Amino acid sequence: MYSLPKLGLMLLALTISAPPSGAIASEGLDGVSFSNDPHMLFVPVEEIALALGWEMHFDQESGQLSLNDHLLDAGHLRKLTNGTLLVPLDELQRAGATITWSDDGMQVLVASDHRKIAIRFADKHVEVDLANQRLRAYQGTRLVLDSHISTGREGKKTPPGEFKAGPVKSPMHRSRLYHNAPMPWSVQVHENIFIHGFRKVPQHPSSHGCIRLPLAGANPAKWFYDWIDLGKPVTIKGHWPAAAASTTTVPVHVERSVPPARSLLRKVIIATVVTIAGSMIIWFVSRDYRKI
């Protein structure tokens, strides 16, 4: 799925040394799964390498990544949007690990020599933070996606509440309310409210009520679509910030009205003062002139 040369920037000459022999990882890891390949479980390469005491090395010249001296198949690897590299369990098995599934299929024990670690097939849930305009997706306790979003603007606010993903899920949905507008990587949340991709996603509410994810960069919209399963809980909470209304408060100077009588009196006083001052100036000038 990803070519190894592209992984070079992230794993440039990276080598993880083995921990002391005999160590056993007592804590488990929450794995990552995807809706378009639901039976495959992934785990971050660096985490599993440390847990099993395996070396991980990227050869810059050949563009190949090895784990426990096994060259990984780049076509089987995935990434989180933050660049974290994920390796599937079958690649771990080819690298020399023993894979043992639990009876309920919700956990797998990965072992190598005297080291072992449990990887959980944890549940997924999504949190939409209206106040901070963020979408965070979790698998178990693992944060797998943290992206800025844009929700419903004033008059079209995104409703808070507890929802479930679906039932509509489409790589290209069309809006029935807004002139057949394209909504790529759409996941329905509630009635006409969808999580979907959009070209420009400002970090403030600007949509007609939907939750917009960026298509640019690592494409969080597509990543979320590939990851989320129908029926998984989606929590929308908080209140959109007041600043999201895109209005700026400008100080306004208000002239206080002056009653007509007071205004006339003021003018008379000013005129009188000016006249007196002028007369005094003329008197002083005339007096000095007569002395000369």
Features from the language model and the residues they span:
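A structural motif detector for short, solvent-exposed N-terminal "entry" segments of globular domains
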Residues: 112-154
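Bacterial N-terminal signal peptides that target proteins for export
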Residues: 1-8
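Extracytoplasmic
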Residues: 40, 60-62, 121-123, 130-132, ...
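Exported/periplasmic cell-wall-interacting domains
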Residues: 157-160, 172-270
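Extracytoplasmic/secreted envelope proteins and their assembly/folding machinery
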Residues: 42-49, 89, 132, 146, ...
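Bacterial N-terminal signal peptides
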Residues: 8-19
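C-terminal membrane-anchoring or membrane-association module
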Residues: 278-292
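Primary recognition of N-terminal secretory signal peptides and signal-anchoring hydrophobic helices
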Residues: 21-123
